[in-house]
């Protein structure tokens, strides 16, 4: 993060920090925001946009289409343009505003709902952590697939070895047709030339994830034959 901030300062470019997975950490490591590092470095001339959303994290309320952006060190003319963009909306997203309020103002210790909030939040994060291990271990058990440990967020990005002349888009499409499993080709994420990957998620239930791994195992063994 420090290197990115220093690079942005040198090149006079803004930083757009997508920090929606700050609660989804499955190892003993604290989340560190760009804003915190920026403050620690006492740098006040690097523009920073920090994003959060109710669609991600442990809430996963995608349908509400609600989030927020915190900005720092923004020139006045940019603020004016942002206000113009905000003003063109015909009406406010009332349900989304309610949900984003709950995100930034969760129950506090002493509140009647606090114990239930902690129980539900920790239960969701514990389940995601378990499913992250199920998926990464399962994919690594398949010959020709290697997957880094999933230490945060909700996704895996395994490397796949496929026959010469094949590509990850073809792999993903055939997997969808033959098994009903939908994954995303790694070529859409700027993967290194000459390598092949796909992206998938840890969101399905635990037993469903095990079933997904078994289907991918059979498919991968037969792919290209």
Each language-model region and where it sits:
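PLP-dependent class I/II
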Residues: 1-225
């Amino acid at each position: 993060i420090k290197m990115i901030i220093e690079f942005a300062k040198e090149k006079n470019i803004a930083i757009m920090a997508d920090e929606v997975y700050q609660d989804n950490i499955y190892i003993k490591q604290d989340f560190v925001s760009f804003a915190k590092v920026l403050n620690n470095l006492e740098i006040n001339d690097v523009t920073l946009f920090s994003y959060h959303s109710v669609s991600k994290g442990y809430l996963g309320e995608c349908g509400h289409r609600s989030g927020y952006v915190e900005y720092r060190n923004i020139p006045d003319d940019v603020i004016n343009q942002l206000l113009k963009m905000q003003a063109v909306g015909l009406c406010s997203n009332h349900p989304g505003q309610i949900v984003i309020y709950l995100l930034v103002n969760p129950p506090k210790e002493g509140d009647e709902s606090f114990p239930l909030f902690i129980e539900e939040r920790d239960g969701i994060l514990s389940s995601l952590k378990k499913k992250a291990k199920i998926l990464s271990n399962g994919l690594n058990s398949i010959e020709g697939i290697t997957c880094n440990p999933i230490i945060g967020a909700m996704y895996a990005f395994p490397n796949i070895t496929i026959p010469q002349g094949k590509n990850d888009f073809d792999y993903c499409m055939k997997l969808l047709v033959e098994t009903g499993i939908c994954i995303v080709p790694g070529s859409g994420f700027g993967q290194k030339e000459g390598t092949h990957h796909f992206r998938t998620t840890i969101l399905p239930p635990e037993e469903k994830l095990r079933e997904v791994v078994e289907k991918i195992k059979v498919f991968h063994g037969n792919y290209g034959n």
